Design a protein with these regions (language model features):
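Residue-level signal for inorganic ion chemistry
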Residues: 66, 80, 108-109, 131
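…primarily DNA-binding HTH/wHTH and HhH modules…
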Residues: 114-140
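Regulatory, non-catalytic segments
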Residues: 88-103
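Pre-recognition alpha-helix immediately N-terminal to the DNA-recognition helix
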Residues: 61-65, 92, 130
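Histidine- and aromatic-rich ligand-binding microenvironments
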Residues: 70, 101, 116
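Basic nucleic-acid-binding alpha-helical/helix-turn surface characteristic of O6-alkylguanine DNA
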Residues: 1-87, 138-140
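Extracellular LysM carbohydrate-binding repeats and other cell-envelope/extracellular binding modules
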Residues: 103-105, 111
């Protein structure tokens, strides 16, 4: 799995075009039965998902830190920055999180502002809120 996103904000064709532009040599496929098992693995914390992530060294460190946030938990951008030993790089952490190529699989939606605000979300704040409510970690 190299990419996973949501199409509600930009539409299916625009999302597909974005992936094709980035991954010119890859064959794309809609695979709903596989997606269900991936979603279950993320929600339960059980199961394996073979992923291939491409990013800068800093981005991959941030994305790996996100993989340690269990379903039902939330954290902050500053907590992630501290966990990767870059406590002053909160904005850079936010930028790296915003570039997450595997929405939901790498659970960037579980990161909030220190104030408790939702912050941004690449696929829309409404979707971020809905996922957090579903996971039981957000009541707002």
């Amino acid at each position: 799995l190299i990419g996973l996103g949501f199409t509600n904000e930009i539409g299916y064709l625009a999302a597909r075009q974005e992936l094709v532009k980035k991954w010119r040599q890859v064959r794309f496929r809609i695979w709903p039965e596989r997606l269900e098992s991936w979603v279950n693995a993320v929600l339960t914390g059980k199961g394996n998902i073979e992923i291939h992530i491409v990013g800068t060294k800093f981005q991959t460190i941030v994305w790996q830190a996100l993989m340690h946030i269990p379903s039902g938990d939330i954290t902050t951008y500053s907590d992630i920055a501290e966990s990767i030993n870059h406590p002053r790089a909160v904005r850079a952490v936010g930028t790296a999180i915003g570039q997450n190529p595997l929405g939901f699989i790498i659970p960037c939606h579980r990161v909030l502002q220190k104030s408790g605000g939702l912050g941004g979300y690449r696929w829309g704040v409404k979707l971020k809120r809905a996922m957090l409510v579903y996971e039981g970690s957000y009541k707002g």
